Amino acid sequence: MTTYHFIGIKGTGMSALAQILHDSGEKVQGSDFEKRFFTQEALEQKNITILPFSKENIKEDYTIIAGNAFSDDHIEIQKAKELGCKFYRYHEFLGEWLKQYTSIAVTGAHGKTSTTGLLSHVLKSAYPISYLIGDGTGNGHVDSEYFVFEACEYRRHFLKYEPDYAIMTNIDFDHPDYFTSLDDVVDAFQSMADRVKKCIVACGDDEQLQGIHTKVPVIYYGFNDSNDFQAQNVVETANGTEFDVFVRNTYYDHFIIPTYGNHTVLNALAVIAICHYEGISVEHMKQLDTFEGVKRRFTEKEIGSQIVIDDYAHHPKEISVTIESARKKYPNKNVVAIFQPHTFTRTKTFLKEFADSLNEADNVYLCDIFKSAREDSGQLTINDLQKLIPNSQLLSLKETEVLQEFKDSVLIFMGAGDIQKFQAAYEETTTKSTNFQD
């Protein structure tokens, strides 16, 4: 039996792919930095071996899958090439693996992970499926017909895939360390659209997606009257959001989702549209109302009188919709944003936009810019962002207890770096504090 060795197995996509291969009966192991990462709990639950990096991990008969964060001079990659091992980058292997299924790619600048999770949740109520979610969740099944996966546009990696279907949630300028402009991003999505084999489900409210040319049918969804699938009569309740769906101007059915914000309605519409196209019953679609969410996307807990939320938001638009969701769910509470910018390039590119979106919160705390593996220095500091946000404060890891003063408030920890360690430090301090009252 082939042994699949994952270099960087704790990465969100890598962890998910390793779990899928394991569940499909393959022999899987991997290596990574020894620092604990939130993805490794699922790997440990499945008894997938995680080793520290060492060239001794690599054997001649192994198939090697390397995370995209690691360069060719990594000790394990060098060893694999010396031994002549079968070698793939993550996106290359995924592109080959999904060919054995009816594949559904979920792509877009924002909303990929939540929509992938939502679609997987609905489909698995109807069929045995495999799915790969960008929060590190992966599930395989030996009898899978469908393979649902998150497809990232960064460095045009999604052009290694030829999916049967694609959901396109939106197009926006991001990853400024790679893309040069919005037009460059649009070009990447156009190339992706050219690779889809059966049908594209796209948000018709997105101006850029309206301009995509395709050789396959396109189903549009959204709030506008021109869409094939339209949400109307949207009502927010204590338990979530309810709305009616019209298919080509004809009433279809009423749906409930346990989330808030127009972006979550759009995610649900995308799922409804592709399920309708595939002939899946409305009863299965209504599993939308039992969706419990994905990791690091509006993940909530209560601490005393506070609601503490962990969210991956790292783009100005994502920050805005996360704050919007908090206000809709908790209309009588103050919203406190605790934000850690991710990469110097993104922070510099969107400095004013970050300030504008964070100003939508009642109070703002800023953590130092996260230095990613792709860059470790920049010409600006967190102070440049602070200057644009009146009354904002800097937050250090040793002083998180200042957040205790916000009684009966919503605290949102946002970022794609290690913002979770700030939340963990706050929770630990609060647990020990005798002064923190409900």
From Swiss-Prot:
Q: Which domain of life is it from?
A: Bacteria
Which GO cellular component terms are attached? cytoplasm
Under which EC number(s) is this enzyme classified? 6.3.2.8
Enzyme class, spelled out = ligase
Reaction(s) this enzyme catalyzes, per UniProt: UDP-N-acetyl-alpha-D-muramate + L-alanine + ATP = UDP-N-acetyl-alpha-D-muramoyl-L-alanine + ADP + phosphate + H(+)
Per the record, the pathway is: Cell wall biogenesis; peptidoglycan biosynthesis
Question: Where is the protein found, in the record's own terms?
Answer: Cytoplasm
Q: Which UniProt keywords are given for this protein, alphabetically ordered? A: ATP-binding, Cell cycle, Cell division, Cell shape, Cell wall biogenesis/degradation, Cytoplasm, Ligase, Nucleotide-binding, Peptidoglycan synthesis
List this protein's GO terms for biological process. Answer: cell division; cell wall organization; peptidoglycan biosynthetic process; regulation of cell shape
Q: Where does ATP bind?
A: G108, A109, H110, G111, K112, T113, S114
UniProt-listed Gene3D superfamilies: Mur ligase, C-terminal domain, Mur-like, catalytic domain, NAD(P)-binding Rossmann-like Domain
Single annotated GO MF = ATP binding
Family per record: Belongs to the MurCDEF family.
Function summary: Cell wall formation.
What is the name attached to this protein's record?
UDP-N-acetylmuramate--L-alanine ligase
| Organism in which the protein naturally occurs | Oceanobacillus iheyensis (strain DSM 14371 / CIP 107618 / JCM 11309 / KCTC 3954 / HTE831)
Q: What is the lineage of its organism?
A: Bacteria, Bacillati, Bacillota, Bacilli, Bacillales
Gene name, per UniProt, is murC
